[in-house]
UniProtKB/Swiss-Prot annotation:
The active site is at K83. This is Probable transaldolase. Belongs to the transaldolase family. Type 3B subfamily. Transaldolase is important for the balance of metabolites in the pentose-phosphate pathway. The lineage of its organism: Bacteria, Pseudomonadati, Dictyoglomota, Dictyoglomia, Dictyoglomales. The gene is tal.
Length: 214
C-alpha cells in the first residue's frame, strides 16, 4: 500500500520525504490557506520535493470551469492530480479530463454510489473520507471495503485513497482491506513508528549494553 502525506506544509513534506516512506502528497484548500504562500509557488515547491502524485484541488463548481482549471493545474507538473468533488458537475468534468489524459482524484466521497460513478468515468483516484463518517457514528472503513468490492466486481482501475484518517488503526485496516493508498496528517504518519513495547525494549537493551565490557 502506498502512503501519501496530507498537508501543504513544506517542512513536514521535506521531513517525511527524507524518511523514504511516503509516495505522494494530497492537499486541499484548507491546507493551502494555512501556509501564507502564493498558491502556484507553493505547489511548484511541493512538486520539486516529491517525485510522486501531488493532489491539488479545483475550486470551481461547473464542469467546464473545473476542466479549464484542471488543464492549468496539470501544466505545473506531470505529477499533478486534480482533486474534484464528488458532485454531478465534478463527475462530468472527470469524464472529460480522463479522456484528455489528465489525472483526477474524486474527493469528498461518502457513499459507494459516488465511488461507483468515479470508477465509471475513469477517475485515477477516489478518496473516501473514513474519519468524517466515524465522526457521525458510522464505521467509515466499511465504505472502503464496499468500494474495493465494487471495483473488483467490474475491473475498475480507479485507485482508492483512504482519506480523513484519524488514527494509526485506520491505516492498518485500510491495508488489511487492500486499499491502494492511505493519506494522513504528519502526526499520524509519525505515530506509525511508535509502540510502547518498542521503547521499553530499546531502553532495556541500551541499559544492558552499558554493562558489556568495552
Amino acid at each position: 500500500m502506498k502512503l501519501f502525506l496530507d498537508t501543504a506544509n513544506i517542512q513536514e513534506i521535506k521531513e517525511a520525504w527524507s524518511l523514504g516512506i511516503i509516495d505522494g502528497v494530497t492537499t486541499n484548500p484548507t491546507h493551502i490557506s494555512k501556509e501564507n504562500k502564493k498558491f502556484r509557488e507553493l505547489i511548484e515547491e511541493i512538486c520539486s520535493i516529491v517525485d510522486g502524485p501531488i493532489s491539488v484541488e479545483a475550486v470551481s463548481l461547473k464542469a467546464e470551469e473545473i476542466v479549464r482549471e484542471a488543464e492549468e493545474l496539470s501544466k505545473i507538473s506531470p505529477n499533478i492530480v486534480v482533486k474534484i468533488p464528488a458532485i454531478k458537475e465534478g463527475i462530468k468534468a472527470a469524464k472529460i479530463l480522463s479522456e484528455k489524459g489528465i489525472k483526477t482524484n474524486i474527493t469528498l466521497v461518502f457513499s459507494p454510489s459516488q465511488a461507483l460513478l468515479a470508477g465509471k468515468v475513469g477517475a485515477t483516484y477516489v478518496s473516501p473520507f473514513v474519519g468524517r463518517l466515524n465522526d457521525i457514528s458510522e464505521e467509515g472503513i466499511n465504505l472502503v471495503a464496499d468500494i474495493k468490492k465494487i471495483y473488483s466486481n467490474y475491473g475498475f482501475k480507479t485507485q482508492i485513497i483512504v482519506s480523513a484518517i484519524r488514527n494509526p488503526m485506520h491505516v492498518v485496516k485500510a491495508a488489511l482491506i487492500g486499499a491502494d493508498v492511505a493519506t494522513m496528517r504528519f502526526d499520524i504518519l509519525m505515530s506509525l513508528f511508535r509502540h510502547p513495547m518498542t521503547d521499553l525494549g530499546l531502553e532495556q537493551f541500551l541499559k544492558d549494553w552499558e554493562k558489556v565490557p568495552k
